[in-house]
């Protein structure tokens, strides 16, 4: 696929399935979407294929959105990604 016409990828991180469904319905036609239900899963996805934007839930079990954001911003490879 031509990189100029390829839709940007957004990573959506939320532990609530209903929220993920809404985001898919709202953004799915304009963007390529990736989903993670935990902070650990989000960090693994970002490492594998960095998105253009991360939409991050704050209140999640095990690792809060604040902790995920802090780890992303401490890493030179991901510090530039808008959260």
Enumerate the predicted regions with their spans.
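Acidic, metal-coordinating helix/loop segments flanking the phosphotransfer/catalytic sites
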Residues: 35-53
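Receiver (REC) domain active-site loop signature in two-component systems and cognate sites
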Residues: 60
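His-Asp phosphorelay/catalytic-motif detector in bacterial-type signaling
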Residues: 7, 50-52, 76-82
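Active-site residues of response regulator receiver
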Residues: 57
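Conserved acidic carboxylate
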Residues: 14
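Two-component/phosphorelay signaling modules centered on CheY-like receiver
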Residues: 17-35
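Non-catalytic signal-transmission and effector/linker regions of two-component phosphorelay proteins
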Residues: 1-11, 48
């Amino acid at each position: 696929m031509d990189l100029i016409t390829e839709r940007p990828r957004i990573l959506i991180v939320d532990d609530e399935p209903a929220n993920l469904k809404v985001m898919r319905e709202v953004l799915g036609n304009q963007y390529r979407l990736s989903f993670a239900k935990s902070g650990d899963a989000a960090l693994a996805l970002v490492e594998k294929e960095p998105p253009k934007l991360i939409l991050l839930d704050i209140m999640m079990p095990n690792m809060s959105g604040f902790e995920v954001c802090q780890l992303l911003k401490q890493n030179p490879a991901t510090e530039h990604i808008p959260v």
